[in-house]
C-alpha cells in the first residue's frame, strides 16, 4: 500500500469520459478505497447540484465535495468551508455591467441556488449543459446583507465581449474579487483566493493530513497548481502538455480509465 491517504480529483475531462459518463472502472475501484479508508474528494467549478449526482454514482456518500473551485465545500448538506464574494464589490460590478455591458448574461450562485434575472439564450444553454434550472429573481435582491452568501458569478456573452470585459475588470479596483476565463465566453467571478490549490490545502487540513499523503488528479490548467502542490500529482493522458509538465506522473486518458488506472497503480498497489 502506498502512503497516499486522500485523493482529490477534478470531474470534467478526468473522471468523466468524453461522452460525459462516469468511468465504469472507477466505480468498481471505489469500494476498495473505502475499505482502505482513503477518502475520494471531487473538486470542480461545478455547483453542488452539478456534482452531487456524480458523487452519488461513485458511492461517495458524505465525502466532502469542493464546489465552485473551492468557494464552497460541502459534506452532505453541511457547509464545512466557504469563501463568499464581497457583496459591496459585486454591487459595483453589477452597476458597471448594467451601464457598459448590458448584453452580458449574469448568473449568481449561492449554495445550491442558481439565480439569474431572465432566462436569456445563454442561461438556457447553460441549463441544457448542466441539467439545472435557474431561479428567476432581481439580481439586486440577492446582494443585500440579509440574503445568503454568494459563492460565484458566471458572466456569459459572445467571446469578444467577454474577453474585452475581462481585460477591463482586471484593470479596475476589485481587491477582494478574482476574474478568470473558464471558456472563451465564460467569465467566472469568485473571492480572491479561491482556487483548487487552496481547496487542496483546506481539505488536507480538514483531514489532518500532510500534502505528501495527498494525490491529486486533473486534466486542465486550473488543475495545475493542485497537481504541483500535492505529494503525488497525476495528469490525465488527455491533458495539454503544459499541464502534464506540472504533474509527477501522467496516466491514461479519460476515455481509457485513466483515474482508475492511477488509483490501482499508485494507491491500492
Summary of predicted features, one role per range:
Residues 2-6, 23, 188-269:
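Mg2+-dependent phosphoryl-transfer enzymes with acidic/Ser/Thr/Gly-rich catalytic loops
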Residues 3-18:
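Asp-based phosphoryl-transfer active-site loop
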Residues 21-123:
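Active-site phosphate-binding/coordination module
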Residues 26, 51-55, 165, 169, ...:
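Hydrophobic packing residues within well-ordered alpha-helices of enzyme cores
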Residues 32, 96-98, 168-171, 242:
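Alpha-helical scaffold elements within enzyme catalytic domains, especially in hydrolases
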Residues 37-41, 61-63, 151-152, 212-213, ...:
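Short active-site oxyanion
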Residues 58-61, 69, 172-175, 229-230, ...:
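Short, structured coil segments at secondary-structure junctions
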Residues 103-217, 238:
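Conserved acidic, metal-coordinating active-site core of Asp-based
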Amino acid at each position: 500500500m502506498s502512503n497516499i491517504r486522500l485523493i482529490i480529483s477534478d470531474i470534467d475531462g478526468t473522471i468523466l469520459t468524453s461522452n460525459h459518463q462516469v468511468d465504469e472502472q472507477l466505480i468498481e475501484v471505489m469500494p476498495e478505497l473505502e475499505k482502505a479508508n482513503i477518502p475520494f474528494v471531487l473538486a470542480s467549478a461545478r455547483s453542488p447540484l452539478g456534482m452531487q449526482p456524480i458523487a452519488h454514482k461513485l458511492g461517495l456518500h458524505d465525502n466532502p465535495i469542493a464546489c465552485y473551485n473551492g468557494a464552497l465545500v460541502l459534506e452532505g448538506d453541511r457547509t464545512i468551508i466557504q469563501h463568499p464574494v464581497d457583496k459591496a464589490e459585486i454591487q459595483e460590478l453589477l452597476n458597471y455591467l448594467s451601464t457598459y455591458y448590458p448584453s452580458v448574461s449574469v448568473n449568481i450562485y449561492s449554495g445550491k441556488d442558481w439565480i439569474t434575472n431572465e432566462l436569456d439564450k445563454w442561461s438556457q444553454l447553460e441549463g441544457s449543459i448542466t441539467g439545472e434550472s435557474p431561479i428567476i429573481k432581481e439580481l439586486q435582491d440577492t446582494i443585500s446583507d440579509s440574503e445568503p452568501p454568494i459563492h460565484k458569478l458566471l458572466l456569459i456573452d459572445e467571446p469578444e465581449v467577454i474577453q474585452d470585459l475581462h481585460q477591463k475588470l482586471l484593470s479596475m479596483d476589485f481587491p477582494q474579487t478574482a476574474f478568470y476565463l473558464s471558456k472563451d465566453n465564460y467569465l467566472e467571478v469568485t473571492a480572491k483566493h479561491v482556487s483548487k490549490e487552496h481547496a487542496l490545502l483546506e481539505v488536507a487540513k480538514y483531514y489532518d493530513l500532510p500534502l505528501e499523503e495527498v494525490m491529486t488528479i486533473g486534466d486542465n490548467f486550473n488543475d495545475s497548481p493542485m497537481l504541483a502542490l500535492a505529494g503525488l500529482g497525476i495528469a490525465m493522458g488527455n491533458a495539454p502538455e503544459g499541464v502534464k509538465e506540472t504533474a509527477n506522473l501522467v496516466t491514461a486518458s479519460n476515455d481509457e480509465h485513466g483515474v482508475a488506472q492511477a488509483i490501482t497503480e499508485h494507491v491500492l498497489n
